[in-house]
Each structure stands twice: as structure tokens, then as C-alpha cells.
Amino acid sequence: MSVLKSKNTKHKKISSTFLAFVSPSLEAMGMPPGERERDTLLKVCWGVWNAVVYADYVGRTDLLNKLLDPSLSSPAGVVLINGLVERKRSRRFADDDRLIGDYKIKDVNGEPRLWAEASSPYPKSA
């Protein structure tokens, strides 16, 4: 049972959704990234996804503002983050109010597989 307010039953598993969100960024790297680069990119995508969910659904913009602060990131980093924010707010992902909690990349038969857990950004009712 979903604890999310949208109760959108069309949502796929969060791991599938997150992979679809991340894939264009991985593909833009040209060749398959090394494990370190891949993990760094996943961490950035994870942070942007969650910051946008908090900003758009809870009204908490401090996390997104920090990610977009040019004094805390390189110009290329800000461009990447802006692109990810735009992608999260695109028609494909905008109605997904799930936070991405823990995630892991596992190797299954030589293929990387993404596992992720979803959680609600909304405060629990007392």
C-alpha cells in the first residue's frame, strides 16, 4: 500500500523509474563509464531527484538551492544539475512524488542491475 499522497498506481518500480531518469546522463558520457564515474553520476542524479521532490511537493527548496549554488559546484556541474532538474520536472517524471532512499548497483550475470527503495516525502501524521 502506497504511503504517497499522489496514489498514482501507474508508477513503475522506483528502480525502473530511476534507471530511466539516469540513463540519458549515462549515455551522454559516450562510452560505458567506469564504476567510480557511474557511482558519482548516480549520486548526483539521486540528490537532484530527491531535492526536486522536496521542492515541488513539500515546498522545501533549500536542498535544490544548495545544489544549484554556483559557488558550491563547477559550471559544468551546474549545467548537469539544471538538466536533471528539467528532466525530473518533465512530463515523464513530474508526477512522481516518491523519494529515492537507499539504492545499489548489483552485477547479475555480467549485467549491472539497479535496486532502489522508495519513501514518502510527506511528514507522518500523528
Predicted regions and their residues:
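Extended non-catalytic scaffold regions that mediate assembly and binding
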Residues: 1, 5-13, 64-67, 112-118, ...
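Short terminal alpha-helical segments
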Residues: 6-50
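Extended low-polarity, hydrophobic cluster-rich segments
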Residues: 17-22, 41-58, 75-89
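Amphipathic alpha-helical interaction segments
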Residues: 26-29, 54-57, 62, 101, ...
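Extended intrinsically disordered or low-complexity segments
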Residues: 60-78
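Amphipathic alpha-helical binding modules
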Residues: 75-126
